[in-house]
A protein has these predicted regions:
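SAM-dependent methyltransferase catalytic region
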Residues: 2-228
């Protein structure tokens, strides 16, 4: 699913892409209306969202806008805390998309939106270290694959990183989970053929323990890219 600006709401990129992939743009006002149904979660900085057909940015851009506004309200006066909270916000958003060009477009839109919002809030550019961290998080969280088969486009299982920020000193615990493991015993609005679905995860009520595929040592969040 994709979203366009109100000023230029194209419904499709091409008829061929609609025929081949069912790719249709979604109006921004409709995206916001749907997100308003879970408004409190979209404004909680660490609330996790997974969009299983994320297109070129759709819901994720609007979720980022809401989360970054929450970061501004809480931490704008302390740049160290703002930087860390903004990384938490980005780390909590996940997407799967079938088309490689859309994956790249989605990552770029989110990155550009982050940098623009950062400048507006801090009246300065993000540090090179922070920008590198955010790019890394987006590369790990926005994946090319099929959420129905739970496989990446290279045939490997879709695997997401769980980023858990510990305390206020910038330390992060990373654990990798296969999507199939995360969705075991979980029901959500998995899209039917020709339809789209949105998974709003993180209900705060875990029902059983998921088994990580891999765990990493506690790391400073700005150094996450060093531990691929």
């Amino acid at each position: 699913m994709n979203v366009t600006d109100d000023k230029q709401e194209r419904q499709v990129v091409s008829r061929q892409r609609v025929a081949d992939h069912g790719e249709v743009y979604t109006a921004k006002r409709e995206v916001n209306a749907m997100l308003d149904l879970v408004k409190e979660e979209t404004e909680r900085i660490d609330s996790r969202f997974l969009e299983p057909a994320c297109g070129n940015g759709n819901f994720l851009v609007e979720i980022l806008n809401r989360k970054m506004e929450a970061v501004r309200r809480q931490f704008a006066r302390n740049r160290f805390e703002y930087d860390q909270a903004s990384a938490v916000a980005v780390s909590s958003m996940y997407g799967v998309e079938l088309l490689p060009d859309n994956v790249e477009a989605c990552r770029n839109r989110l990155m550009n939106q982050y940098l623009e919002t950062y400048r507006e809030h801090q009246h300065a550019d993000a540090s090179p270290e922070l920008e590198r961290c955010i790019r890394f998080l987006l590369r790990k969280n926005i994946l090319c694959g099929d959420a129905l088969t739970m496989l990446q486009n290279n045939g490997e299982p879709i695997t997401f990183c769980e980023w858990t920020f510990i305390g206020t000193n910038g330390k992060v615990k990373r654990r990798d989970f296969e999507l199939s493991e995360l969705l075991r015993n979980v029901e959500y609005d998995k899209p039917k053929p020709g339809e789209e679905g949105l998974l709003f995860a993180d209900t705060g009520e875990p029902t059983f323990v998921h088994l990580p595929k891999r765990e990493y040592p506690l790391t400073d969040y700005l150094k996450l890219p060093d531990y691929e």
